[in-house]
Amino acid sequence: MKKLYEEASVQDIADAIREKTGGAETYRIAQMGAAVRSIPDGDQIAHADIPDYVKDGVLTLAQKVQAVKTASSIVFVTVADAHHATDESTGWKANIDTGNMDACRAIKALSHVIPLDFAAFLGDLTFGYKTTTAAQFEAQCREFHHWIEEGLRGIPQLWTPGNHDTGEYFAAETGSLTNLYGAALIRKYFSDYNAGAVYGSAEAGYCYRDLPGKKLRIINLNTVEGEITGGETAADALSEAQLLWFAQTLADLGSKADSAAWGFVILGHYPLDWGSARAGGKVLKAYLDGGSVTIGGKTVSFAGKNGAV
């Protein structure tokens, strides 16, 4: 009998349902209609449910920001190291879930009282333990995105993964790099949330956003690029392609006619003075010194192209 549907399309519908519910259920075709109808209307985070200590903290922070904010100020929020656990059994799972929900509540409340120029997630979204499977990784990503998205609606975002988002510890425990979560899942739950940015690589997610009104370039690096394919023993944090893109992105910014009026922010999970991420730090130092770098046989000179700081 001829099929009246494409299996990939059915899988896409199931994925969409799970993204909306934050769950990890599987569905037969006959169950999908009921599953869609059961998705609750409105927001999951109600202001009435936000604890007083969160509201008080947000109000105090908002007052401090307002006291120093000027027309040229850049206001943003960063989140990192949620280590979301979902169904993983840990001694501190309850604290993780409570803390992450309250953090998402705080971001939603803050976004209602302070206009945010952008938001960034700097990695280690997932629990990423040696027993964390790819299915658990996906469930953790879906639930956390479901919680945080209400506070970030309409705000330019930049997401980058951390070492606990690669599956490298599960791969090491099982003795097989085939158990890494893979580039496709990293793209789905991190890189794709950078939509609207100027990508160096849509798959790896490194990109930049310009805020012309504030004369700011936000450069988003993937400092675990090597670990996504090579695991915890990967020699390089950033590929040559990413390092070259980083150098060219800095040179492009420094070449602007009004570059001295511009600034930049660099995002990533690892700082650029740590481990093999230092290769990125060398690019940055060469830029600040007005020197040059040669990467993969290509030389980028920053002479006269380093006005932006």
Language model region names:
Residues 131-245:
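Extended active-site neighborhood of metal-dependent phosphoesterases/phosphodiesterases
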Residues 73-87, 215-229, 267:
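Active-site-proximal beta-strand elements of phosphoester/diester hydrolases
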Residues 51-53, 57-136:
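N-terminal active-site segment of His-dependent metallophosphoesterases
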Residues 81, 123-124, 162-163, 269, ...:
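Active-site glycine-centered loops adjacent to acidic/histidine catalytic or metal-binding residues
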